[in-house]
A protein has these predicted regions:
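Transmembrane alpha-helical segments that form core, pore/gating elements
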Residues: 26-29, 34-36, 51, 149-210, ...
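Hydrophobic/aromatic residues within transmembrane alpha-helices
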Residues: 31, 39, 94-95, 100, ...
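Hydrophobic transmembrane alpha-helices of multi-pass small-molecule transport proteins
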Residues: 129-146, 270-289
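Loop-to-transmembrane-helix transition segments
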Residues: 9-17, 61-90, 155-163, 203, ...
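Transmembrane alpha-helices of multi-pass small-molecule transport proteins
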Residues: 35-86, 166-170, 189-205
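C-terminal transmembrane-helix exit sites in multi-pass transporters
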Residues: 110-135, 253-272
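Helix-helix packing/entry segments at the starts of transmembrane helices
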Residues: 103-109, 177, 181-193, 229-260
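Hydrophobic/small/kink-forming positions within alpha-helical transmembrane segments
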Residues: 18-22, 52, 81-89, 111-116, ...
Length: 299
């Protein structure tokens, strides 16, 4: 019987996460005119409930070991929760104001920032080629952001970009937590609860009543978010970022397809050039890292 390698499992899970997060964006946009903080709260609430049910089941089967937080993990749980919240809020704000594909590609700057934060947190080396790829990918993102003196016009794309920064830090934190053997469901519960708490002040002062349809759309978004979170946590548990991060870009394909089918969205020329630059740099970095590792193993 053929044994599936951890890298193959990581690739499978990262593509699953890309699909779920692209579909989540569709449901968030279909929910209509609701403040992005309120949307984020419901997204996290559903993910929290699903993760909590799984944790209670683990607790019943494995006892207190299922909920124990390893020594040294608390700092990185907070870091993952804060960074993930920045990622969610930035992404949700962007989804409401720009093309799904634009929001997705700027959010997919995350793998480049994962490399940077893995260097800072895990002391994984950044070699010259990946560093050049990061710089050129950043220049590609500028074509999508389209800097101007009109802050209102730029804000959604900047929010999407900062969402990518936050997601990159969150992924690096997940990798560190995997080394510390922290339960993946605990990571999701901690993040979801933290992000929900950040939303509470807004909900107390400015809650918008929702229709049954809007509630249903946000519940679907939350279910997709939970699927995405479980998948990305599993992916970085099974394999390091430098082996699987390239496959995260499959979300661009899903988002472009969903944006066209559901909202008749077509990216402009500058954005398309930006997509090509960022994805090309991701492919170059992946091939370089893969060849470097194979050369090391064959020595």
């Amino acid at each position: 019987m053929r044994v599936i390698s951890n890298t193959s499992k990581g690739i499978f899970f990262i593509i699953c996460s890309a699909f779920f997060f692209a579909l989540m964006a569709v449901f968030v946009k279909l929910a209509g005119d609701i403040h992005f903080v309120q949307k984020a709260f419901f997204r996290n609430a559903v993910a929290f409930i699903i993760a909590l049910i799984g944790t209670l089941r683990d607790l019943r089967q494995n006892g207190r070991e299922a909920i124990q937080i390893p020594k040294g993990a608390m700092l990185f749980l907070f870091l993952r929760a804060f960074a993930g919240s920045v990622g969610v809020f930035g992404n949700f704000y962007a989804i409401d104001h720009i093309l799904l594909a634009d929001a997705a590609i700027l959010n997919k700057m995350a793998p480049f920032f994962t490399i940077i934060f893995c260097f800072i947190i895990l002391h994984e080396k950044i070699r010259p080629v990946p560093l050049i790829c990061i710089i050129i990918a950043f220049l590609g993102s500028i074509l999508i952001i389209k800097p101007s003196f009109n802050l209102t016009q730029m804000l959604p794309t900047l929010a999407a970009f900062m969402g990518g920064v936050g997601a990159g830090l969150a992924y690096a934190s997940i990798r560190k937590l995997s080394y510390l053997k922290c339960n993946g469901k605990i990571i999701i519960i901690f993040f979801s609860a933290f992000s929900m708490m950040l939303s509470v002040p807004y909900l107390i002062t400015s809650f918008n009543p929702m229709t049954l349809y809007q509630t249903g759309m946000l519940c679907c978004a939350g279910a997709c978010a939970a699927g995405g979170q479980f998948s990305v946590t599993a992916a970085y548990y099974h394999a390091p970022a430098n082996k699987i991060s390239i496959y995260d870009y499959s979300q661009i394909l899903f988002s472009t397809l969903f944006g066209f089918v559901f909202f008749a969205q077509i990216p402009d020329l500058l954005s398309l050039i930006g997509y090509i630059i960022i994805i090309t740099m991701a492919i170059i970095n992946f091939i370089y890292t893969h060849n470097k590792e194979n050369a090391h193993l064959n020595k």
